[in-house]
């Protein structure tokens, strides 16, 4: 029986991951969070533990010889580095580039295995983009993520959303620092729907580019219903992006008081363009709750790593352990009773 430590184990994604593990008795699961809060589950071999991972020495309080799933970006890179120095494996779901970069630096020179982008986005979105980037004609990729507001998301996800609206990023074309929302794009998230506005944001892109490739990758964020995206676009034009980022916690608390509306779904579109700016192809994904999809992607990655050949030391990405078809097959298996999913590949328009 192997040890599996879930940092953030009682949160929105963590609680779903614990439930998915109910059919995997080969794991001794340690659900760790700042507040000890039991999650309803039939799994017998789960231990709930309260631990502030930000305090010094927290790494020594975790079980040894474990695979660690890192869900909160509050986890210090130093803790991750300490676990990797013990030749352990850490799976990370983070969507903030600066944090992911810090984890990659922490993995340097260790015998452990850090896998970034283990989730829905980044994760499945990474695999979709990497599949398109394998075409040598591809010069630019634009990846749009749309989150439905059919329910209130967990605190960590909501805080990330508001932070992302004010976190500058380096433009792939010019290299200069750009404020989110400065270069929006419109995406067809499904074939029979008008293009929807999406706002440019900072996002991790590890694993997308083929070895030696120089594909430019742009990331965008949208909300369903679309008028919410337009409201955020107005706020950004008024220069409120940085303010929203700095007050992400306060805005998250406020958002939890708002009514739930829109679709309870997650949609991703990855579009490939050649050097003339002509669309080559695109991939469209539609699924259910983002937290369900992220938990299932973690499960699929765990299964792939257990059944795979050699474990890769240092920092690598989900692309090093899964391909797109494996991920989709695993999602359908784990989420068979939750809701429909669809993936379409659209060739270059005539």
Language model feature labels by segment:
Residues 7, 135-271, 278-279, 292:
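Active-site-lining helix/loop region of Rossmann-like oxidoreductase modules
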Residues 236-350:
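C-terminal active-site/capping subdomain that shapes the small-molecule cofactor and substrate pocket
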Residues 31-36:
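N-terminal Rossmann-fold cofactor-binding loop
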Residues 4-21:
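N-terminal Rossmann NAD(P)H-binding glycine-rich loop of SDR-like oxidoreductase domains
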């Amino acid at each position: 029986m192997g040890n599996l430590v879930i940092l953030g184990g009682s949160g929105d994604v963590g609680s779903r991951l614990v439930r998915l593990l109910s059919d995997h008795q080969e794991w001794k699961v340690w659900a760790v969070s700042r507040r000890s809060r039991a999650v309803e589950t039939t799994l017998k071999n789960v231990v709930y533990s309260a631990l502030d991972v930000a305090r010094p020495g927290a790494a020594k309080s975790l079980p040894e010889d474990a695979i660690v799933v890192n869900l909160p970006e509050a986890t210090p890179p130093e803790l991750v580095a300490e676990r990797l120095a013990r030749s352990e494996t850490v799976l990370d779901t983070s969507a903030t580039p600066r944090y992911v970069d810090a984890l990659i630096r922490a993995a340097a020179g260790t015998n452990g295995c850090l896998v970034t982008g283990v989730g829905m986005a980044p994760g499945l979105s990474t695999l979709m983009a990497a599949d398109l980037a394998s075409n040598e004609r591809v010069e630019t990729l634009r990846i749009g993520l749309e989150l439905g507001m059919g329910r209130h998301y967990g605190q960590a996800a909501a805080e990330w959303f508001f932070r992302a609206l004010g976190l500058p990023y380096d433009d792939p074309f010019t290299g200069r620092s750009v404020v989110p929302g400065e270069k929006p794009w419109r995406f067809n998230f499904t074939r029979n729907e008008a293009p929807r506005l999406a706002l440019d944001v900072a996002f991790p892109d590890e694993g997308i580019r083929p070895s030696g490739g120089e594909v430019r990758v742009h990331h965008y964020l949208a909300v369903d219903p679309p008028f919410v995206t337009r409201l955020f676009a107005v706020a950004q034009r008024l220069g409120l992006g940085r303010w929203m980022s700095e007050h992400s916690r306060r805005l998250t608390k406020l958002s939890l008081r708002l009514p739930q509306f829109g679709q309870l779904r997650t949609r991703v579109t990855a579009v490939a363009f050649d050097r003339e700016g002509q669309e080559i192809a695109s991939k469209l994904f539609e699924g259910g709750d983002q937290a369900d999809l992220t938990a299932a992607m973690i499960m699929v990655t765990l299964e792939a790593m257990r059944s795979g050949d050699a474990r890769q030391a240092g920092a690598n990405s989900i692309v090093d352990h899964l391909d797109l078809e494996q991920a989709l097959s695993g999602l359908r298996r784990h989420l068979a009773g939750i809701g429909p999913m669809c993936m379409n590949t659209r060739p270059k328009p005539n």
